[in-house]
């Protein structure tokens, strides 16, 4: 993932009352859209390295990201139905009495698993696992280019963590 997409995803996260970059009525869909666009950076990263192993690693990572994106979206249906809105501010305000993690425990578990898979962490790091011959789609990258891929992955992990807290707690 590049750094720009997770940073754009942070734009709709309400950190405190009135403390967000932008409040849109479809903040949840914006978040899902930004995580879906990260697939292109993985594909282009594997393709741009001009290495067949990096391309195969990029294709495997992209297939994994697309497949878990469906479960991530489906796990949020209960949250949207209980809050009645796609706005993250409205979702947080709907949890003033009771958190959604109690009534939507299955959605929370599915969202956590899909978030871990989206961020390429154990046990879902198959394209970059220890038993692989190459390091996935960033085989040919080093220095600052590799650091930007890693920074994007860790920003995506932080964004998923912020969304878990925003949507369920």
Q: What function would you assign to each model-found segment?
A:
Residues 1-169:
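Selective transmembrane helix interface/packing segments
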């Amino acid at each position: 993932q590049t750094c720009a997409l997770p940073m754009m995803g942070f734009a709709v996260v309400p950190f405190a009352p009135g403390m967000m970059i932008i409040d849109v009525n479809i903040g949840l869909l914006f978040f899902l859209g930004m995580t879906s666009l990260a697939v292109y950076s993985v594909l282009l990263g594997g393709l741009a390295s001009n290495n067949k192993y990096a391309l195969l690693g990029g294709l495997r990572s992209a297939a994994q990201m697309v497949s878990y994106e469906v479960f991530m979206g489906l796990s949020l249906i209960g949250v949207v139905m209980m809050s009645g809105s796609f706005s993250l501010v409205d979702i947080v305000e709907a949890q003033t009495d009771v958190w959604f993690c109690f009534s939507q425990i299955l959605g929370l578990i599915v969202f956590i698993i899909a978030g871990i898979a989206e961020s390429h962490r154990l046990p879902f790091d198959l394209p970059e696992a220890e038993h692989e011959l190459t390091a996935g789609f960033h085989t040919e990258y080093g220095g600052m280019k590799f650091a930007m891929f890693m920074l994007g992955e860790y920003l995506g992990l932080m964004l998923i963590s912020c969304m878990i807290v925003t949507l369920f707690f």
